[in-house]
Amino acid sequence: MNKSEEAYARLTQKIETGELPPGAILSEAALIDAAETGRTPLREAVQRLIRDHWLLAGGGRGLQVPPISVDDQLERLEVRRSLEALAVGLACARADEEQLAAVAAHVRHLRTVEDLPAYVAAVGRSHELLRTIANNRYLADSLVPLQGLCRRFWLATTKGLPDEVERGRAFYVPALEAVTRRDSAEARAGVLALHDFLARSALDYAARSAAHGSAEPPAPWAEGR
């Protein structure tokens, strides 16, 4: 990766985990510090971050980390749903044996994950596999920000909920296992079931927020920092 790509990766990771919290207004100096880079690579990275919806242009106030929004999450899921269904269909037809072996190994690992941080990492790996095994770089590039911002929403809105690891795993494992068998119908069905679950999760968060009069959750992982 060049310096601009490194800056993009650092900033997206910090936005996803809440280290740069939802709604934060960031100056160029703050972004340079967070990205651990210089002004030129940062400005190149910022153009991409705005295009990919990781940052919002804030006029003279600086750049803003997008607030957590149920409407935005549902819009992302509408697009991601179709792209991931396409991805698993392509993977069943195109993935080579080495790629399928990597998926099978990941499924075995996913079954053993117990704590939330390890599960978060496993979800990220699941998303990476869904992008790469389709062997279509345009599809992969489209999925990167959608998956990352969806993970941010999930982290911010489900932290502390019981059985969240088991609930998510119950959808990822069948979809990925179907890919290892090259069963495109089952893989697509698994992905669509996952997205039904994610949409319900977003709506459940909206209902909880309305009941408690809260419009935005605290930043994920903020406790103990």
Q: PLM features: residue spans?
A:
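All-alpha effector-binding/dimerization core of bacterial HTH-type transcriptional repressors
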Residues: D52, P66-N135, D141, P145-G148, ...
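Juxtamembrane/interface motifs at transmembrane-helix termini
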Residues: R43, R94-E97, A122-V123, A140, ...
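C-terminal all-alpha effector/ligand-binding and dimerization domain
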Residues: A156-R225
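Short helix-capping/turn signature of helix-turn-helix
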Residues: A29, Q147-G148, L194
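Secondary-structure transition/hinge residues
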Residues: I15, E19, A91, A95, ...
